[in-house]
């Protein structure tokens, strides 16, 4: 007999503990974004395919589930990333504004997981700034990313920063090189294969510089010094390096000292076809993949009639909850007996209004068999009144 309870690979349920943890974190993050002036938007799950794939290169196309609209016959896609949708909202629906700060939290669906054990249905949360080309907008979203990870309580964070314009200007000098393969080998830090691929251009300084990019990795000060040495022959690299220095020297990010270490990684070219400037990735101890990514994607709304500067970040709430699962403690609740006594119901309402969780047992339900909760107090009828028992109230 077919196991009807099985789910597709990379798709999973969230059971009560994890779902409660995720929802609590989602609310805390969105409240934080709101207090920073970011407005919540909720794009639809499905859109016309050409809208979903705007400015994304081929990566997002491969990740997108496609279907045919039974009403119009047009090709639709289930969103694999929310940023193109938010850029459409900024460009078309909120075009009367100057600078937009927008945030979101919703599920996406992907044909393939992002990692070996990753989910194909991440619950993506993020924040984006549209309409400001200065480094200040990048610093604002990086600061908000670090605050988000602090709220998630994942421990110390390493933030790797890059500027995709550096690899771009080197690749532009190597006529005929297979850029996609170069980018893959850079990301994998496969120097032997990269050296072999670049052998026909071995006499060109740009090839040597590309091979040196993986060495421009590590603690910010030493990695930046190495980067300036490697890229010294290219004056056009100076503004990009200065932008990296501006982020590293930001007083706003300095307040995270002790919990965040800043690093440079010029070989991290993930999102090369998507990002147009600064890129960044956040890592936590014991987890190989980045837990948060972001960067600049200027002009993403051009296809919607309004190409603007844009920068932002995203996180996967499922992944954050999985990483903090060992920190989860069952919610403390108050157990009340089943009764229609108005005095008991009024007492329960008062406790709930104060933020307490009160579970009223159904007839015949055994309080000793409550799963997934910590019943640290009970309500009993004591000396003619309904009172809390089991803990000093």
Which sequence ranges carry the predicted segments?
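Cap/lid and interdomain-hinge subdomains that line or gate substrate/regulatory clefts
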Residues: 133, 137-138, 160, 167, ...
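Acidic, His- and aromatic-enriched active-site or binding-groove loops in soluble protein domains
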Residues: 63-70, 176-198, 203-206
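Positively charged, Gly/Ser-enriched RNA/tRNA-binding surfaces
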Residues: 18-36, 48, 83-96, 102-154, ...
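TRNA-binding/sensing appendages of the translation machinery
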Residues: 1-84, 139, 160
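A structural signal for short, well-ordered beta-strand segments and their strand-loop junctions
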Residues: 40-43, 104, 158-162, 263-264
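Extended alpha-helical scaffolds
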Residues: 152-159, 164-168, 177-179
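Beta-rich nucleic-acid/ligand-interaction surfaces
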Residues: 45-61, 162-172, 268-277, 368-372
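Short, basic, helix/turn surface patches
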Residues: 66-78, 187, 382-393
